[in-house]
């Protein structure tokens, strides 16, 4: 009954984002396994470059695009936040779509074999094994230095352990060791295109993965629209530019605000929040305030949008890393290890992922070949590659090295990867079976 109620709730609250009935829902344990037809898709990828820049193109078909994100809604005299990253899709469709790429130049041992699963670990947020927030806050590095209350992606190389199965979120290497890894290039470059938090400003979000999922150097393209001291939003829409100080809740959840409308708030359409305005029930102000980024954080430019039933996005960055400590330089003739992910109106681990692949700049042996262009990248002919993406389950680095994984010895030997042992006809079902078995064993 719980499973059916969740599916009906999503459909009733936001018909445009209605999904088929999920296979399993247990929100108390961070579980949402969507229907089989919603757990697999295809991301089309093409890449080109010239003497200065590299560009990657994405096409992702969807009938339910989301360029909305979290909002403040006025209720009974208070501003209440709406929009959740999971479990599963947000019931009101108030979470952005996202397309991500992790990229490595061969310096992160194991990424070519395990892909994104090498960054997924027991205790991470949104897993059934999620660590208690207070424990993270009390950790000297994650809570003290980073100010975090959850565990996110990290490289096992940043933890101190002799046994990979025993790798733990709290065994973080000391600062000198982390600095050395970063100087040696032992980190993953992470390009995150965000339909709400970055795209309206003409950018993708430049991040990297080391001992945590970290932001690249510079100013972010989004911040939180909230004044802690006044306990109210910091900004509202400028009525002279937008026509009203807020959006309307009913219009928002009916998906009436298009890509060319003021569905996001930013430096060019905002004024300081006026608490004395005659606010009405259901007035809505975006929870994220957008701004022009700087430094390496803003190094990836984004173009395109949703058109003819698909996201059609182009991301462009200089071949040279904007900052060698958080980004990878791309060299003509070289090949790189990559892994992709797609979020559809959901956050955290509720996404679809690819197997590890290779991206080559004129390397014909790579899975995805970036073609060289003399001159303007806008004039390039594109060579598309279809990348299958699917639900990644609760497979973690620790699980892959444990007795629960039938391929444990092959993983530990380090000579064969997921693509050597699995095919996409059977792997997605195996992953779901493993998640259900782990949940059963924990009962």
Q: Each PLM stretch: what is its role?
A:
Residues 1-19:
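Gram-negative bacterial Sec-dependent N-terminal signal peptides
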Residues 20-22, 72-274, 322-443:
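Acidic/polar low-complexity flexible segments
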Residues 43-46, 300-305:
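Beta-strand-rich interaction surfaces with strong enrichment in secreted/lumenal proteins
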Residues 49-51, 60-64, 319-321, 342-346:
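Beta-strand elements of well-folded, non-transmembrane domains
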Residues 53-60, 311-317:
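Short, well-ordered beta-strand segments enriched in hydrophobic/aromatic residues
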Residues 264-296:
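Surface-exposed, low-complexity/disordered Ser/Thr/Gly/Pro/Asn-rich loops and linkers
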Residues 296-298, 305, 312-321:
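A beta-strand/beta-hairpin structural motif
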Residues 302-309, 326-331:
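Exposed beta-sheet edge/beta-hairpin loop segments within beta-rich domains
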């Amino acid at each position: 009954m719980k499973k059916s109620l969740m599916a009906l709730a999503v459909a009733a609250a936001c018909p445009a984002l209605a999904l088929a009935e999920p296979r399993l829902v247990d929100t108390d344990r961070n579980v949402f396994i969507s229907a089989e037809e919603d757990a697999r898709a295809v991301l089309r990828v093409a890449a080109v470059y010239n003497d200065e820049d590299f560009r990657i193109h994405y096409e992702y078909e969807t009938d339910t695009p989301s360029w909305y994100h979290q909002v403040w809604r006025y209720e009974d005299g208070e501003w209440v936040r709406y929009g959740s990253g999971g479990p599963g899709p947000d019931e009101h469709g108030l979470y952005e779509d996202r397309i991500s790429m992790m990229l490595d130049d061969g310096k992160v041992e194991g990424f070519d074999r395990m892909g994104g699963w090498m960054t997924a670990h027991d205790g991470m947020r949104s897993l059934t094994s999620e660590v208690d927030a207070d424990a993270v806050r009390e950790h000297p590095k994650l809570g003290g230095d980073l100010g975090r209350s959850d565990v996110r992606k990290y490289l096992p190389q940043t933890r101190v352990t002799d046994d990979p199965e025993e790798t733990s979120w709290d065994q973080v290497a000391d600062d000198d060791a982390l600095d050395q890894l970063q100087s040696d290039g032992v980190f993953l470059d992470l390009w995150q295109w965000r339909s709400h938090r970055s795209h309206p400003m003409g950018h993708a979000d430049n991040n990297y993965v080391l001992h945590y999922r970290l932001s690249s150097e510079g100013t972010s393209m989004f911040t939180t629209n909230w004044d802690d001291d006044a306990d109210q939003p910091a900004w509202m829409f400028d009525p002279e530019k937008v026509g009203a100080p807020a959006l309307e809740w009913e219009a928002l959840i009916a998906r009436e605000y298009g890509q060319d409308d003021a569905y996001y708030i930013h430096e060019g359409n905002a004024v300081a929040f006026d608490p004395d305005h005659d606010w009405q029930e259901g007035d809505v102000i975006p929870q994220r305030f957008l701004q022009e980024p700087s430094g390496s954080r803003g190094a990836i430019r984004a173009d395109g949008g949703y058109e003819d039933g698909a996201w059609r996005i182009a991301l462009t960055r200089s071949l040279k890393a904007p900052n060698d400590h958080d980004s990878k330089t791309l060299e003509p003739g070289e090949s790189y290890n990559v892994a992709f992910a797609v979020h559809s109106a959901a956050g955290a681990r509720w996404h679809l992922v690819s197997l590890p692949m290779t991206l080559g700049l004129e390397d014909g042996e790579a899975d995805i070949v970036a073609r060289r262009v003399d001159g303007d990248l806008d004039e390039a002919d594109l060579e598309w590659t279809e990348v299958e993406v699917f639900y990644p389950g609760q497979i973690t680095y620790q699980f892959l090295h444990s007795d629960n994984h039938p391929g444990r010895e092959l993983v530990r030997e380090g000579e064969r990867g997921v693509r050597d042992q699995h095919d996409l006809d059977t792997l997605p079902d195996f992953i779901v079976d493993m998640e259900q078995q782990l949940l059963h064993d924990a009962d």
